Amino acid sequence: MSKKYNVGIVGATGMVGQRFATLLENHPWFNVVCLAASSRSAGKTYEEAVGKKWCMDSPIPENMKNIVVMDATNDIEKITSQVDFVFCAVDMKKDEIKALEEEYAKHECPVVSNNSANRFTPDVPMVVPELNAEHINIIPAQRKRLGTKRGFIAVKSNCSLQSYVPALFPLQEKYPIKKVLVCTYQAISGAGKTFETWPEMIDNVIPYIGGEEEKSEKEPLKLMGKIVGDEIVSADSPAFTAQCIRVPVSNGHLGAVFVEFEDKKPTKEEMINIWENFSGRAQELNLPSAPKQFLHYFTEPDRPQIHSERMLEHGMAVSIGRLREDTQYDYKFVCLSHNTLRGAAGGAVLLGELLAAEGYFD
């Protein structure tokens, strides 16, 4: 791509915002020109605003250190005049986020969001680029509702889904799935925390993550849904049930998946072959952040593991293992992904690349 887009990060000081900053530092298509956060950070340089809260392994990007942070709520006009689109990862109440993202869109500024507020707005595409890239075709209908020419909102799905739904998607296309039971084991960075800021998680497991189980049961059906008229209609099946558990791991979500097929079921060999040969629109377009191979299957009985697999293909691949027949369901297996790369900022950057490649920012 010859053109480079000027972008902003709204919610730049939080953990996901910091991850956006590191991913966009040397991005071939996107140039960060604007950083925004709460009024507490506004007026400070990015380095001053983040201070000791910086929690990435790499240092604050040199080209962003001295950018003066704007107020995400009160400087919308100024922000939108400087950028082609924004990435959004703010920590606010859901109704406030929904209103904020619409305000940016109505200022003719596309929003690529990591937030959950608009995931079930009927004409807002919730996209994993390898799985349901065609859902961005709803954007003209959304623009009509908003009364915009350029502005729109596109979102990524919940971080936990991106460990196990990619494994189900290509199976569902060839062998319809009846029901899925999934137990997720989720890293503390999914709550925006580190062990320094959440010492209670050391040597501990918390069997509850607020709202996570509902998201894990509903969001896959929207990803599997279809555009009907001016909205995306969620699929009726498969039926999902989920249990979500917080575990003492810095990064990486793992899902233990049990699956039952409608009628004919594939063999284990067929399932592994489907996974290893699956690719989507992100690979077709050769997007900069896309993994060369999206799904990787491991034959070792003790894989995938957080330490060895979470950074596979720069943290953008999904690792699968332990596929075997089950006594109650047809099969069971384990999936793993990096929750702040594939599951959050990395997935949003990939969505931004898809939208750029398909001409939605022009």
List each language-model region with its residue ranges.
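Charged docking surfaces used in two-component/phosphorelay signaling
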Residues: 189-362
